[in-house]
Amino acid sequence: MKNLIILAHPDIENSLINKRFLKEAAAQNFAVRDLAREYPSGEIDGERERGIIKAHDALVLQFPLHNFSSPAILKSWIDTTMTYGFAYGRASEGMPGRAVALAVSAGIKRADYAPSGRYHFTMEQILAPFELAFRYYFHAHWRGFFAFYGAEETPGVDYQSSTEQIEKGAAEYAEFLRNLGAKSGAGKKF
């Protein structure tokens, strides 16, 4: 199975978590497309991206959560790449049946993503537009998401994850990636 990670991180060189997780992906022979490196101007070549997708069996969209959404380059990539005839519409052949999952890093604590938490919404609710698009509109084989939660105390001010937390998260991410091609279930949500 040929697997591809679409990395949408605006500053991967200074990332601790996403950079560490890419090492796990490399160990499992995942190809990586770094959108910020490929498209520094932000202008996505949709035809090129569709060709790359066709060469892979599964996609993982990996990104840090920014303002409870994805970085702008990922939205642009989706809008430019997932077009009529490829991702949706009659005779679309690009996405139907292809495995798709998300890998999200969030600086905020897991407990804050709950109806009784600071932000009142679960990660499932925040990521629902991705599931709606990929599972129900593009008819991809939705495999769920992996989420790494941080330890933010004051919003936007002080957050960090210990080396132990990052390594534990990396091991869980590796397991998530190994299970990506499994035939049953919707992907394990960590």
State where each predicted segment sits:
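Short histidine/acidic/glycine/proline-rich micro-motifs that form metal-
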Residues: 10-12, 38-40, 117-120, 151-153
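Generic recognition of short, well-ordered alpha-helical segments
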Residues: 16-20, 44, 72-76
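Hydrophobic/aromatic beta-strand patches that form the interior of the parallel beta-sheet core
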Residues: 4-6, 33, 60, 101-103, ...
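N-terminal beta1-alpha1 ligand-phosphate binding loop
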Residues: 1-33, 164-168, 172-175
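N-terminal beta-loop-helix "entrance" segment that forms/cooperates
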Residues: 30-54
